[in-house]
A protein has these predicted regions:
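N-terminal beta-strand motif that seeds the catalytic metal site of vicinal oxygen chelate
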Residues: 33, 56-62, 80-111, 115-129, ...
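Terminal peptide-recognition signature
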Residues: 10, 51, 75, 94, ...
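Vicinal oxygen chelate
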Residues: 3-13, 26-50, 93-102, 133-138, ...
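Extended, hydrophobic interaction surfaces within ordered domains
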Residues: 2, 26, 32-86, 207, ...
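Short, small/polar residue-rich loop motifs at catalytic or cofactor-binding pockets
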Residues: 4, 65-68, 130-131, 185-187
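Active-site region of chymotrypsin-like
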Residues: 53-62, 89-90, 171-179, 183-186
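Short, glycine-anchored, charge-dense loop/turn motifs used at functional sites
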Residues: 74-81, 193-203
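Conserved short beta-strand elements that form part of the metal-binding/catalytic scaffold
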Residues: 1-28, 81-83, 124-156, 200-205
Length: 245
């Protein structure tokens, strides 16, 4: 409806989030969770209390061997959070769980994503059968964690959690689009699903300026043009914004 909030961008502990009003079709799952590294126990208890309120406890907040004080919960909106004591300032790091058909493919995914986006692997903890119990990596300077889970789970990746990066021009958008949708799937409005089922988006500063312009009529034209396409075409959206298409 006109006047309803569609998107909002916020920063939590140095991690940028873009929230979308996507409707009931977008249901989050623990396949992607967010690891909150807290500065001290007081902060940890407060964060846990807020996130766990009216939520679903997956692992109670307590002391675990090798993990220390740790808890895992789905908040009241269904988003999944791992809360633990960190060593420095509070941080939030996305965590990707590879289970079921993806079990054992975490290292391959890291290698592919680094080849596409640029980055590096930061740590490796091996588990059973030489799988990745946990591994840290960076994509374009952003920290992520991935783990192979041997357990059978009923959940998988959904569009409720996706990763997005800003790209400066159409050439970069095209390269990433072709790489991620190869053996994957194309979705409307610049969304991509890779061959592991993880969802990605390509964003551009100009695109955001057009679709969020204070000139509501121009913004509407740009947004409607974007809704018509799968891969983002900056030139076509700009023409719609300028009224020249």
């Amino acid at each position: 409806e006109i006047g309803d909030l569609l998107t909002i961008t916020l920063e939590l502990a140095g991690c940028e989030f873009l929230l979308l009003n996507g409707g009931d079709d977008f249901s989050p799952s623990p396949a992607i969770s967010y690891v909150v590294n807290c500065e001290n126990e007081e902060q940890l208890l407060n964060v846990w209390k807020q996130l766990n309120h009216d939520g679903e406890t997956l692992m109670p907040l307590t002391d675990y061997p090798e993990l220390g004080k740790f808890g895992w919960t789905n908040d009241r909106y269904g988003f999944s959070w791992q809360v633990r004591l960190g060593e420095n300032l509070q941080t939030i790091i996305p965590c990707i769980m590879f289970a079921n058909n993806n079990y054992g493919l975490a290292q391959a995914a890291i290698d592919e994503w680094i080849a596409i986006f640029g980055g590096k692997q930061t740590f490796v903890i091996k588990g059973k059968e030489d799988r990745l119990r946990a591994s840290g990596f960076q994509l374009r300077g952003h920290d992520l964690i991935i783990m192979d889970s041997p357990e059978k789970h009923t959940f998988t990746f959904t569009m409720a959690n996706s990763f997005y990066f800003y790209f400066k021009d159409q050439t970069d958008i095209d390269k990433v689009w072709e790489a991620l949708t190869y053996d994957g799937k194309e979705w409307p409005c610049g969304w991509m699903e890779d061959r592991y089922g993880v969802f990605w988006q390509t964003l551009n500063k100009d695109l955001l300026n057009w679709t969020n312009s204070s000139d509501s009529e121009k913004a509407r034209h740009a947004t409607q043009e974007m809704y018509k396409m799968k891969k983002i075409n900056l030139a076509q959206i700009k023409q719609a914004f300028d009224g020249t298409n």
